[in-house]
């Protein structure tokens, strides 16, 4: 059993000069900056995010990162000419080039950033699953790539509440582009999915939680795009046992509760900190029922704790074909762990939630640099795995909370010298 310990993952002290590994990683991205000084500002910003100091705003980073100042860091996020979307696309293609198992899935989820005041772009009193309540916050919709042994962020988009989208004065003050209009979180997720198609990101399926899985328009959007998916749904998800109208719609939990215990089988999906993660599962071929009565063939999957385990039942829906092994769908849906882990780590370790500006572009540039910084850590871990092949089953995807950044960078230094 592999025991994991929560550790600090940040650099204990900012070096006076560039880290050789970071310089190598960032070299391909310098093409997005017209001047060397501009690219150097990006390197200093990333270095600041990797530092152990808990505050990651421009003022604080300028005070602890040599070779820069608050004005340069702020200029990088606001007025400097560079295309953050194009840089992010290049980063995604770079990460896809890493030798890996190639069995990735696309994860979508949203996360909240608690805020004071009313001027930060998109901030409003709104519900966020991060806080489990209505509170003053910003919310982003995010896309993540996850294989069994490699996981990293793809894209993020700020959710713009209707009160912001329809307020011309606030839009102008926050520099919100004209093309950005009100969209639901599910609609934003579908747009991010379309972007992954344009980049040609190979993937086996889409995985989301019940906030998206219980959204018929989202599922219909996936099917219209010919996407396979395994999604979490709520207990009252509407299904029917047959296609004809004589088969009435029923709640998912009622149907699964009627199944005999002997029909449920134990499946384990990965190793956790306390051993194998496993539970009892049952799958039923049936139809989901839209609000207008339209029926779509797929799998209703139930999960309940095994003997001696605590926890509540969970429900999933998938449009995988009839011959798909249940073990495959179970393993896919539980990869959602990696986007939740990223949300926690990008905030706690890299300062994703600490952008203090008020503008749309600055918010997204900061997020792009956070994703770049996270990808740097994943890349370092990937390099070490290439030189330190281990026997036995593949290791889980890298997570910064499993190994300190200082150790990762120190070990990588021997590779780069």
For the regions a language model picked out, list residue spans one by one:
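Catalytic-loop motifs flanking and including active-site residues across diverse enzymes
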Residues: 139, 312, 338, 368-371
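Short, well-ordered secondary-structure "scaffold" segments embedded in the functional core
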Residues: 188, 211-217, 292, 323-325, ...
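Conserved, well-structured core segments
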Residues: 142, 318, 331, 370-373
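Conserved, well-structured functional cores that handle cations and Mg-NTP chemistry
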Residues: 2-207, 211-230, 234-238, 244-246, ...
């Amino acid at each position: 059993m592999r025991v994991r310990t929560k550790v600090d993952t940040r650099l204990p002290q900012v070096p006076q000069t560039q880290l050789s590994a970071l310089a190598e990683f960032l070299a391909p991205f310098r093409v997005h900056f017209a001047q060397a000084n501009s690219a150097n500002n990006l390197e200093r910003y990333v270095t600041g995010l990797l530092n152990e100091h808990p505050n990651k705003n421009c003022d604080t980073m300028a005070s602890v990162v040599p070779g820069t100042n608050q004005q340069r860091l702020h200029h990088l996020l606001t007025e400097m000419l560079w295309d953050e979307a194009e840089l992010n696309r290049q980063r995604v293609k770079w990460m896809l080039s890493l030798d890996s198992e190639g069995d990735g899935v696309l994860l979508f989820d949203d996360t909240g950033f608690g805020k004071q005041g009313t001027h930060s772009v998109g901030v409003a009193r709104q519900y966020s699953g991060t806080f489990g309540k209505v509170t003053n916050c910003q919310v982003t919709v995010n896309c993540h790539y996850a294989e069994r042994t490699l996981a990293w962020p793809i894209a993020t988009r700020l959710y713009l509440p209707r009160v912001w989208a329809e307020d011309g004065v606030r839009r102008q003050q926050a520099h919100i582009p004209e093309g950005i209009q009100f969209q639901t979180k599910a609609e934003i997720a579908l747009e991010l999915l379309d972007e992954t198609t344009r980049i040609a990101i190979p993937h086996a399926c889409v995985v989301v939680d019940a906030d998206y899985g219980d959204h018929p328009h989202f599922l219909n959007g996936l099917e219209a795009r010919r996407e396979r998916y395994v999604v979490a749904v709520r207990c009252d998800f509407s299904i029917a046992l047959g296609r004809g109208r004589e088969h009435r719609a029923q709640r998912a939990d009622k149907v699964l509760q009627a199944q005999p215990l002997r029909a449920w089988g134990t499946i384990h999906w990965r190793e956790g900190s306390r051993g194998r993660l496993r539970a009892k599962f049952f799958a039923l071929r049936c139809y989901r029922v839209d609000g207008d009565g339209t029926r779509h063939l797929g799998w209703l999957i139930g999960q309940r704790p095994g003997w001696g385990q605590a926890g509540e039942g969970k429900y999933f829906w998938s449009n995988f074909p009839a011959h798909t092994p249940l073990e495959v769908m179970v393993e896919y849906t539980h990869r959602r762990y990696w986007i939740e882990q990223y949300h926690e780590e990008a905030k706690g370790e890299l300062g994703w939630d600490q952008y203090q500006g008020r503008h749309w572009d600055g918010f997204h540039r900061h997020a792009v640099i956070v994703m770049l910084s996270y990808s740097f850590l994943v890349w370092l871990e990937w390099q070490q795995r290439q030189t330190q092949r281990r026997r036995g089953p593949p290791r889980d995807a890298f997570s910064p909370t499993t190994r300190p950044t200082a150790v990762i960078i120190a070990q990588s230094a021997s590779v780069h010298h």
